[in-house]
């Protein structure tokens, strides 16, 4: 039971705002493109898929962040008790958790069309490199915006896999939204 609690601490399940910040752009993309005259079943199913995907990928992202920041986290009062920084969970076990979470997310991803699957796979390096941006740029919030709002594009293409300027415009608007909330948070 202690190990399970440590896992829940590791994925920050008690702080679900990160999940919602990843999920909301997905729901916006789905809502923008969905043809509600055909009913709601696909829309609701895709909302569920994107919510589960956001939960799994945010969880994996938290673990990767903690692995990459473990030497810094131990020095900061707010983060020194995180499971990896404190030594309660090993890096190797944490990596196993990341593989499991990403595998489960992939099982959800393959429920979509080929373009959406491809977009999801392309997003992986960006999702896991955000913690490094805090070290190498003065604008990590901008990188976070590009990464966290990518689901809007994926959701649009999951319904209509052809190019349109509409999701791009909303995507850039969402990036500015992220710049705002993450600047306030930081």
Regions found by a protein language model. Give the residues of each.
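Multi-pass alpha-helical membrane architecture of UbiA-family
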Residues: 1-186
């Amino acid at each position: 039971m202690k190990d399970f609690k440590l896992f829940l601490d590791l994925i920050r399940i008690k702080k679900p705002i990160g999940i919602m910040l990843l999920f909301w752009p997905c729901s916006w993309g789905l809502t923008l493109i969905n043809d509600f005259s055909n009913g709601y079943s696909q829309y609701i199913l895709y909302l569920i898929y994107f919510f589960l995907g956001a939960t799994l990928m945010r969880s994996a992202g938290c673990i990767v962040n903690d692995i990459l920041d473990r030497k810094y986290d131990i020095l900061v009062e707010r983060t020194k008790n995180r499971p990896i920084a404190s030594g309660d969970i090993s890096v190797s076990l944490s990596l196993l958790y990341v593989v499991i979470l990403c595998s489960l997310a992939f099982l959800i991803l393959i429920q979509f069309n080929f373009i959406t699957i491809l977009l999801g796979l392309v997003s992986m390096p960006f999702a896991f490199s955000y913690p490094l941006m805090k070290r190498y740029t003065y604008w990590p919030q901008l990188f976070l915006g590009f990464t966290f709002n990518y689901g809007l594009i994926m959701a649009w293409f999951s319904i209509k896999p052809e190019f349109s300027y509409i999701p791009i415009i909303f995507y850039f608007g969402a990036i500015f939204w992220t710049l705002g909330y993450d600047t306030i948070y930081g």
